[in-house]
């Protein structure tokens, strides 16, 4: 605590999550200073200095029972959270306090949640591929080690299930440390995730930070920074960390909720005018340096399935790979419902992924694109009016579409079939056989919900 620790102020106004506090004029708190309500653990974070000793703050917790005249103390420092190994295997809230009833977190090191992004000369771009074991992702939008990935999708198309499968496949194979930030999502999912990690014996390598749907906007606004601070510490120690955020949209939404109360004019669609800056501050910190790497996977909710909405649109520019989940594909019963024509990755370059992988990816996309163009003709005139080449393209495209589906480990309860991890070599071999016409004699249903191409051949024998 600094010398300003003893400075006291009084609450002069409460509007929802935004609280105004008056301090002596000569000792106004700095922006982002943490203030503590006298006699309780409630923390306020300074957002604006209104002048005349009055500061406007966001309440990080429920503001029930607050009234004018209550005493508030200035800690003189920004919010600091415990970092390092003692956080592993623990569930914490936005202030780094344990919420898993497993005793205090014995961490000697604390770090402010507001840090500067690494300088440009410290950054370390990576082209090494990170195998996920999910066919559609490894083929169409491969991830880079130390890269940033976004899972975009509307309500109920499978963002969280996809993220859980990625955590299952990468975190277990990866063997390093992971940080999971639950930002404004369902408490049930947080609970499921905790037990999933516990059952698979990787809980002692994961730090969990939650600020869920039922919490005030201040918590949801800052919880992503809390998780990121913990991940940054591991990175600066020279480790390779995985950082999962579910859901980045709720971070934006929490900012929108408090923006109007802070007296800012809303911008497009009612979002805060500082949307790009807030997103930039967060995203620029999620990066790999010469010391260590942060590989991040972020779920991004797409309001009303509109990818041009300011929130997802702002997120797009920061990512290395975008996995777009489509309602049309989900409605066909193809899961993961990844849109192979909309999803992209900066790694799709023959110099990075190799000539074979690159050409197979492009051939698969061309076949699917041709099928998309022919769909209207098929709907009106039927398949008989197509040329033999087009008929072949359609047949192969439908097989590719089904082969892009895959049973997940985390969805075994729903599908009843065991999950499959498909190595990248097998994925490339399978799709090469389909586009080369080596599977033209097989029925398309043989490709649905299988792992490798060999399983499709086995399934075809049973069908025939």
Curated annotation (Swiss-Prot):
Membrane topology: Peripheral membrane protein
Purpose of the protein: Produces ATP from ADP in the presence of a proton gradient across the membrane. The catalytic sites are hosted primarily by the beta subunits.
Protein name: ATP synthase subunit beta
A cellular component annotation (GO) from this entry: plasma membrane
PROSITE patterns: ATPASE_ALPHA_BETA (PS00152)
TM region(s), chain numbering: none
Source organism superkingdom: Bacteria
Binding site residues for ATP: 153-160
InterPro entries on file: ATP-synt_VA_C (IPR055190), ATP_synth_F1_bsu (IPR005722), ATPase_a/bsu_AS (IPR020003), ATPase_alpha/beta_chains (IPR050053), ATPase_F1/V1/A1_a/bsu_N (IPR004100), ATPase_F1/V1/A1_a/bsu_N_sf (IPR036121), ATPase_F1/V1/A1_a/bsu_nucl-bd (IPR000194), ATPase_F1/V1_b/a_C (IPR024034)
Reaction equation(s) it catalyzes: ATP + H2O + 4 H(+)(in) = ADP + phosphate + 5 H(+)(out)
Quaternary structure (record): F-type ATPases have 2 components, CF(1) - the catalytic core - and CF(0) - the membrane proton channel. CF(1) has five subunits: alpha(3), beta(3), gamma(1), delta(1), epsilon(1). CF(0) has three main subunits: a(1), b(2) and c(9-12). The alpha and beta chains form an alternating ring which encloses part of the gamma chain. CF(1) is attached to CF(0) by a central stalk formed by the gamma and epsilon chains, while a peripheral stalk is formed by the delta and b chains.
Family that this chain belongs to: Belongs to the ATPase alpha/beta chains family.
């Amino acid at each position: 605590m600094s010398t300003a620790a003893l400075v006291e102020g009084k609450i002069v106004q409460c509007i929802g999550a935004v609280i105004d506090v008056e301090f002596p004029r000569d000792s106004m708190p700095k922006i982002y200073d943490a203030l503590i309500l006298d006699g309780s653990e409630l923390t306020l974070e300074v957002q604006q200095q209104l002048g005349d000793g009055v500061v406007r703050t966001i309440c990080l917790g429920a503001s029930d029972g607050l009234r004018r005249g209550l005493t508030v103390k200035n800690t003189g420092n920004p919010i600091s959270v415990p970092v390092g190994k003692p956080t592993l295997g623990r569930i914490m809230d936005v202030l780094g306090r344990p919420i898993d009833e497993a005793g205090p977190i014995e961490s000697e090191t604390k770090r402010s949640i507001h840090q500067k992004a690494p300088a440009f000369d410290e950054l370390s771009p990576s082209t090494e591929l990170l195998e996920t074991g999910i066919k559609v992702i490894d083929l169409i939008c491969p991830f880079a080690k130390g890269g940033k990935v976004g899972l975009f999708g509307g309500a109920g198309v499978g963002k969280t299930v996809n993220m859980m499968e990625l955590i299952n496949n990468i975190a277990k194979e990866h063997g390093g440390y992971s940080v999971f930030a639950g930002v404004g999502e369902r408490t049930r999912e947080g609970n499921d995730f905790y037990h999933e990690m516990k059952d698979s014996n990787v809980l002692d390598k994961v730090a969990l930070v939650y600020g869920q749907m039922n919490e005030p906007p201040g918590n949801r606004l800052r919880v992503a920074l809390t998780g990121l601070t913990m991940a940054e510490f591991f990175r600066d120690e020279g480790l390779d960390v995985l950082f999962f955020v579910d859901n980045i949209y709720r971070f934006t939404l929490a900012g929108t909720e408090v923006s109007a109360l802070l007296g800012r004019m809303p911008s497009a669609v009612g979002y805060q005018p500082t949307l790009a800056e807030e997103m930039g501050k967060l995203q620029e910190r999620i990066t790999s340096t010469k010391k260590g790497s942060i590989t991040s996977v972020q779920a991004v909710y797409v309001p009303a399935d509109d990818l041009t909405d300011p929130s997802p649109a702002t997120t797009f520019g920061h990512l290395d790979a975008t996995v777009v989940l489509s309602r049309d594909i989900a409605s066909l019963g193809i899961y993961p419902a990844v849109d192979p024509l909309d999803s992209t990755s900066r790694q799709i370059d023959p110099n990075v992924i190799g000539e074979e992988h690159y050409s197979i990816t492009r051939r698969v996309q061309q076949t699917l694109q041709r099928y998309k163009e022919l769909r209207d003709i098929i709907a009106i005139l039927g398949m008989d009016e197509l040329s033999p080449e087009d008929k072949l393209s359609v047949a192969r495209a439908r097989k590719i579409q089904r082969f892009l589906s895959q049973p997940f480990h985390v969805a075994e309860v729903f599908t009843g079939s065991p999950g499959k991890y498909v190595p990248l070599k097998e994925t490339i071999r399978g799709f090469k056989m389909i586009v080369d016409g080596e599977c033209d004699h097989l029925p398309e249903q043989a490709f649905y919900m299988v792992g490798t191409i060999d399983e499709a051949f086995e399934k075809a024998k049973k069908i025939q």
